[in-house]
From Swiss-Prot:
This is Kinesin-like protein KIN-7C. It comes from Oryza sativa subsp. japonica. Keywords: ATP-binding, Coiled coil, Microtubule, Motor protein, Nucleotide-binding. ATP binds at G119, Q120, T121, S122, S123, G124, K125, T126. The keyword rRNA processing does not apply. Transmembrane segments: none annotated. Residues 461-483 have a biased composition (Basic and acidic residues). The keyword ATP-binding applies. One of its GO terms (cellular component) is microtubule.
C-alpha cells in the first residue's frame, strides 16, 4: 500500500499520525476551540407586516450589536464577538465557504468533524443545515475524484431524537432504538442502518428520504417547524491502493456529523398546546442539558460533566470537548419580539467558543497488519515462556551494569593519563633540582679558567671555540626572542661586537666566546649518566650568566669605539621580537637583517647557503662574513661618510620561513646531540647517556600544552576560526613545539594583562588594541556569523542532524545560534573540542587542512612593518600581530 496524497494529508503527517493505534486514535492530538458563527436572518413577512424593527445589527465580520435603546436589561452586553458573523444578505454558500468548510472537510484527513445549527424556532436552522450538508458532500466527492491514489468508502446513517426517543430515519419501521456504551466504539445506537454510498446522487436520494421521515409541525411562529433533533452521520474510510506499495497498511476512519437541532420556544409565544406543548417541553429540556454541558466545559474545571442527562448529549459527547473539530452556527432573528431568545442564543455561543477540543487523526490497522502484529506478539510471548529468566527487569539491570562499566573504563583511562603526566612533572622537577648542584661541582673540576686578559683557553682550538660560541649564542638568541613576546623586550641584553684597534678589545671579544663555550660545555656534561637532559631554557640560562658579567665592560668599550661593527641578528629573532628591544641602543644606523637562523642547531644543511657564519680573523682583528657580497658589509665609519645606512634586509617568503621553523624543530634534538657528543669528547668528558629519552616525553608534553592553550583560548575569548586552524594544523609532531610554545606564552601574557585590567601593548597585539570586553564582543559577532553560515553551508537534513547532535530541540527558536553558542565551550572535553573544530571548519569552507594552510598560519609569526621615525634613521618597527 502506498503513500497518502494530497495537501490535507500532508498536514496529517505533521500532526504526528504515523504511529497506529489498534482500533483507536493515532498521533498527537491538536488542541482547538469550538468555532462559533452567527447568521442573522432577515425579517419574515409576518414581522414586516407587524412593522417590527430589526434590533440586531452586524457592525463588522466578527461582531453583532444590539442597537435598540429600549431599556430591557441595562446590565446585559450590547455587543457580542464571535469567529465570524454573517448579516442577513449573506447566502448559505458564503456561510459554508467562509465559516465551516475547513472544519467539514477535516473528515477526509481522518479527523472527526461536527456542525451544529442552534437557535430559536423559526430562525433558519434547517434552511442553513440543508445547504451546508449539500455543499460539504459535493466537496468530499470532488476531493475523492482528485485523489485516485487512495480508495475511499463512504457510509451514511441518519437518526432523529423525538421526545427523547431515538428513531432510524432510513428505516420504514417506527421502532425505538437503544443507546449502548462500548469501550472501543464509545456510545453507539443499536441496530442503526448504515448504507454504503454509491455516488452523489445516491446520497441525495437518502437525504430526501430523511426529510420526509422527520417529524415536523405547524406552530404560531412557523408554518413548518422541526419537532425533533436530526443527526446525519457521514463516515469516510480511506486507504492507499494496493498497487502503490505494500508497506502502508493503515486506514483512516472519520465521521462528519450534521446536527439540526430543534428550536427553543416559549409556550406563550408559540401558543402551543397538547402535542405541540409536549414536544416543546422535551426540546427545551434537551437543549437545557446541552447548554449545561457547554457551560461546564467552557469553565475548564475537572468537575462532573452531565452528558447522560440527555440522549442528545450522550450521542454528541465526542463532538463536545472530545475527539472532533466542531463548528456551531447560531441562527438569530432580529425581530423585537425575539429579543430575549436571541440574547440567550448569543450567550450560548459565547460559552461554546471557550470549549476546547482535542481532535486526533483516527488510524485503524487493516486485517493484514493486525494479523502480522499479533503473530509477532505471539512469538514474543512464546520466547518469554521458553526463557523465563530473561525478563525486562533483568535486561534493564544488564544495561545499567554495562553503562557503569563503560563509565569506569573512561575514568580509569583519565586517571592513567593524569598519573603519567604527574610522573613526568615529578621527573622534571627532580632533574632540575639535581642539575643545580651537579653544575656547581662539575664547573669547579672541568671549567677552563681564563686569564685576566680574558683570552682564549689553550686546550680548545680557535675554530672549535668559534663554532661552539656561535652555536650557543644563536641558540640563546632564539629563546630570548621568544621570551620577549611576554616581557615586551624591555629586559633584553643587547650585545654588540666591533673591530677594535687595541689588542685588549680583541682579547675581550675572544674571551666572550671562550666563556660562552665553557659555560655551554659545563652545562651539557655536568649530568650523571642515565638521567634525561636538561631543558633548553635551563641550558641557555647557564650560558647567559657570563654574558651578564661581561655586558657592562663590553658595552662601555664598544659604544666609544670608532670602528664599531654591528653583528647581524638572525631574521627569525627580528621577526619575533618587538621594537622595544632596539630602543636602548644609542646609534643612528639600522642593523642589517642578513642572517637567517644560520647557526641554529636544528638548521637544515641546505639553508646555510642563504647566509654564511661570522668568523673571527686573528690576523686582521676584524669580523668578516665568508662568502657574502661586499655590499652586505658596512661599517659605522662608512655610515658617517655617506650620511645614511642602507638597511639590507633579505626577507624570505612566508612559506619558506614556516618551513624553516618546522625543519629546525624537527632535527633540533638529533643535531644538538651530535654537537654535544663532539664537544664533550674534545675536552675529555663522557657523552650524556639516556638522551634518547627526551623526545619520548613530547606526546605527554604536547597534550598538556594543548589543554592549557584550549583553556586560555576560552579565558581570553580568542576567535573560533583561529582556534580551529591552530587545532587542526598542529597535531603533536615534534616540529610543532615552536608553535605551541609561542602560542602558550602569548595567551598567558594576554590572560595576565586582562587580569590586571590593562590593555596589551602594540608590540604584542600589533595594530589592534584589545580588551576583555572587546574580545567578547568580537567572539559574539563571530558566533552570529557562523550561525548565518549554517543556512548557506548546510542542507536541511544536515542542519537537523547538527541540532540533534548538539542537543538543540528541533521545536525551539534560533536553533542555529544555539549551536553556535555551544561551540568551543567544553574545554575539558577533547571530543567536544574536536567536533567544534570540525563544524567550524565546515562552515568556513575548510575542507582538508594541509601545508598551504600552515603557510597561511605562518603569517601570524611574520613581522608587521609600521614606518616609524626614530631620530635620524629610517628604521622599521616590528611586532607580533594579535589573534585576539
Amino acid at each position: 500500500m502506498g503513500a497518502i496524497g494530497g495537501d490535507e494529508l500532508v498536514q496529517w503527517d505533521k500532526m504526528g499520525a504515523a504511529e497506529a493505534v489498534n482500533g483507536g486514535c493515532g498521533g498527537a492530538g491538536k488542541m482547538d476551540r469550538i468555532q462559533v458563527l452567527v447568521r442573522l436572518r432577515p425579517l419574515s413577512e409576518k414581522e414586516v407586516a407587524r412593522r417590527e424593527p430589526a434590533e440586531w445589527e452586524c457592525i463588522n465580520d466578527s461582531t453583532v450589536m444590539f442597537r435598540s435603546t429600549f431599556p430591557d436589561r441595562p446590565t446585559a452586553p450590547t455587543a457580542y464577538t464571535f469567529d465570524r458573523v454573517f448579516h442577513s444578505d449573506c447566502s448559505t454558500k458564503e456561510v459554508y465557504e467562509e465559516g465551516v468548510k475547513e472544519v467539514a472537510l477535516s473528515v477526509v484527513s481522518g479527523i472527526n468533524s461536527s456542525i451544529f445549527a442552534y437557535g430559536q424556532t423559526s430562525s433558519g436552522k434547517t434552511y442553513t443545515m440543508t445547504g451546508v450538508t449539500e455543499y460539504t458532500v459535493a466537496d468530499i466527492y470532488d476531493y475523492i475524484n482528485k485523489h485516485e491514489e487512495r480508495a475511499f468508502v463512504l457510509k451514511f446513517s441518519a437518526i432523529e431524537i423525538y421526545n427523547e426517543v431515538i428513531r432510524d430515519l432510513l428505516s420504514a419501521e417506527n421502532t425505538p432504538l437503544r443507546l449502548w456504551d462500548d469501550a472501543e466504539k464509545g456510545t453507539y445506537v443499536e441496530n442503526l442502518t448504515e448504507v454504503v454510498l454509491r455516488d452523489w446522487n445516491h446520497l441525495k436520494g437518502l437525504i430526501s428520504v430523511c426529510e420526509a421521515q422527520r417529524r415536523t409541525g405547524e406552530t404560531f411562529l412557523n408554518e413548518k417547524s422541526s419537532r425533533s433533533h436530526q443527526i446525519l452521520r457521514l463516515t469516510v474510510e480511506s486507504s492507499a491502493r494496493e498497487f502503490l506499495g505494500k508497506d502502508k497498511s493503515t486506514t483512516l476512519v472519520a465521521s462528519a456529523n450534521f446536527v439540526d437541532l430543534a428550536g427553543s420556544e416559549r409556550a406563550s409565544q408559540a401558543l402551543s398546546a397538547g402535542t405541540r406543548l409536549k414536544e416543546g417541553c422535551h426540546i427545551n429540556r434537551s437543549l437545557l442539558a446541552l447548554g449545561t454541558v457547554i457551560r461546564k466545559l467552557s469553565m475548564g474545571s475537572n468537575a462532573h460533566i452531565p452528558y447522560r442527562d440527555s440522549k442528545l448529549t450522550r450521542i454528541l459527547q465526542p463532538s463536545l470537548g472530545g475527539n472532533a473539530r466542531t463548528a456551531i452556527i447560531c441562527t438569530l432573528s432580529p425581530a423585537t419580539s425575539h429579543i430575549e431568545q436571541s440574547r440567550n442564543t448569543l450567550l450560548f455561543g459565547s460559552c461554546a467558543k471557550e470549549v476546547v477540543t482535542n481532535a486526533q487523526v483516527n488510524v485503524v490497522m487493516s486485517d493484514k497488519a493486525l494479523v502480522k502484529h499479533l503473530q509477532k506478539e505471539l512469538a514474543r510471548l512464546e520466547s518469554e515462556l521458553r526463557h523465563p529468566v530473561q525478563s525486562s527487569s533483568l535486561e534493564t539491570l544488564l544495561k545499567e551494569k554495562d553503562n557503569q562499566i563503560r563509565k569506569m573504563e573512561k575514568e580509569i583511562k583519565e586517571l592513567k593519563s593524569q598519573r603519567d603526566l604527574a610522573q613526568s612533572r615529578l621527573q622534571d622537577l627532580l632533574q632540575s633540582v639535581g642539575d643545580h648542584d651537579l653544575n656547581r661541582q662539575v664547573q669547579g673540576k672541568h671549567s677552563v679558567r681564563s686569564p685576566p686578559s680574558v683570552g682564549m683557553p689553550p686546550s680548545v682550538s680557535r675554530d672549535d671555540s668559534s663554532q661552539v660560541s656561535h652555536d650557543d649564542s644563536d641558540l640563546y638568541k632564539e629563546v630570548r626572542c621568544i621570551e620577549s613576546n611576554r616581557t615586551g623586550g624591555n629586559d633584553q641584553l643587547d650585545l654588540s661586537a666591533g673591530e677594535s684597534s687595541s689588542p685588549q678589545d680583541s682579547n675581550m671579544n675572544s674571551g666572550l666566546h671562550g666563556n660562552d663555550s665553557n659555560a655551554s660545555v659545563n652545562s651539557r656534561h655536568s649530568r650523571p649518566s642515565g638521567e634525561a637532559p636538561i631543558t633548553l631554557e635551563e641550558h641557555l640560562e647557564n650560558i647567559r650568566r657570563p654574558f651578564v658579567s661581561l655586558a657592562k665592560d663590553l658595552g662601555s668599550s664598544t659604544r666609544n669605539s670608532s670602528n664599531l661593527r654591528v653583528i647581524g641578528r638572525s631574521r627569525s629573532c627580528r621577526s619575533l621580537t618587538g621594537s622595544t628591544m632596539f630602543d636602548d641602543m644609542e646609534m643612528d644606523d639600522c642593523t642589517p637583517l642578513n642572517r637567517s637562523l644560520v647557526e641554529f642547531p636544528g638548521r637544515p644543511v641546505e639553508s646555510h647557503r642563504r647566509g654564511s657564519a661570522l668568523h673571527y680573523d686573528a690576523e686582521t682583528d676584524t669580523l668578516s662574513r665568508a662568502g657574502s657580497m661586499s655590499s652586505e658589509i658596512s661599517t659605522f665609519k662608512d655610515a658617517k661618510t655617506n650620511g645614511s645606512v642602507a638597511c639590507d634586509t633579505e626577507f624570505t617568503g612566508i612559506g619558506e620561513f614556516v618551513a624553516e621553523l618546522k625543519e629546525m624543530a624537527q632535527v633540533h634534538y638529533q643535531k644538538q646531540l651530535g654537537d654535544q657528543n663532539a664537544n664533550g669528547k674534545s675536552i675529555g668528558l663522557d657523552p650524556i647517556e639516556g638522551v634518547s629519552q627526551s623526545p619520548s616525553r613530547w606526546p605527554l608534553e604536547f597534550e598538556k600544552k594543548q589543554q592549557e592553550i584550549i583553556e586560555l583560548w576560552q579565558a581570553c575569548s580568542i576567535s573560533l576560526v583561529h582556534r580551529t586552524y591552530f587545532f587542526l594544523l598542529f597535531k603533536g609532531e615534534a616540529a610543532d613545539s615552536i608553535y605551541m610554545e609561542v602560542e602558550l606564552r602569548r595567551l598567558s601574557f594576554l590572560r595576565d594583562t586582562y587580569s590586571r585590567g590593562s590593555t596589551p601593548s602594540n608590540a604584542i597585539v600589533g595594530s589592534l588594541s584589545t580588551s576583555p570586553v572587546a574580545s567578547a564582543k568580537k567572539l559574539q559577532r563571530e558566533r552570529e556569523m557562523l550561525a548565518r553560515q549554517m543556512q548557506k553551508r548546510l542542507s536541511t537534513e544536515e542542519r537537523e542532524h547538527t541540532y540533534t547532535k548538539w542537543g538543540v530541540s528541533l521545536d525551539s527558536k534560533r536553533r542555529k545560534l544555539q549551536v553556535a553558542r555551544r561551540l568551543w565551550t567544553e574545554t575539558k572535553d577533547l571530543e567536544h573540542v574536536r567536533e567544534s573544530a570540525s563544524l567550524v571548519a565546515k562552515l568556513i569552507g575548510l575542507q582538508e587542512p594541509g601545508q598551504v594552510l600552515k603557510e597561511m598560519f605562518g603569517l601570524s609569526f611574520a613581522p608587521q612593518q609600521q614606518p616609524t621615525r626614530r631620530r635620524s634613521s629610517n628604521g622599521w618597527r616590528y611586532g607580533i600581530p594579535s589573534f585576539a
